[in-house]
Amino acid sequence: RKDGSPFVTHPLAVAQIVAEELHLDSESIVAALLHDTIEDTEATHEQLAKLFSPTIADLVEGVSKLTRVHYTSKEEEQMENLRKMLMAMSKDIRVILIKISDRLHNMRTMEYQTPEKQKQKSFETMEIYAPIAHRLGMQKMKWELEDLSLKYLDPVGYREITEALDEKAAEYDGFMSAVHDRIVTRLREEGIEATVYGRMKHPYSIYRKMYTQNKSLDDVFDLFAFRVIVDTVADCYNVLGI
């Protein structure tokens, strides 16, 4: 690999993402380990089916087919068509999940690629893979794919936002903790049991607000998001009314 590590580190890392972050089954983990074999070696679908299983061979072949698809246009309509095509090609949803895991690890190690390759892969990730992750409900992966893409598409903007957030981390943590406690207390006063989560919005989300609305970070007021989880639909509506 470009970073000097053995090639096997990549399939191992992809398999780890599939196992630990997506919690997929053993067939998916094995397929993730083998996902580059048809593309990069002389191994065939038939050999993989015989050595492992037909299902694993199908998964690996499916990932290989997705790998050979590249965008040719920056037009939104064409991008949408490509997203639909990738989803349609993935007859088994695990194929696209493995491919997204593959892309995520490649983006995590993108610093070793040329600037041209960094921008090309980042644009492709931002326009194709992050939206697909969103459609599949994989929000944490979507956010990370977007942030990693922004890092190479606009290094200056990315650095300004992350450095500003780091500088104010203690202040923001204190604010979020206070808001969390206030929400929990208010709900208890109403007799509603709930689980409350708070998080800082991720850099790309903040970047979009800053650069599409021409605002500074200090002018972006919705930097935080809170999630309130209750047991019943009735409680949900009660919370909305508080």
Segment roles from a protein language model:
Residues 1-223, 230-242:
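Active-site helical microenvironments for divalent-metal-assisted chemistry
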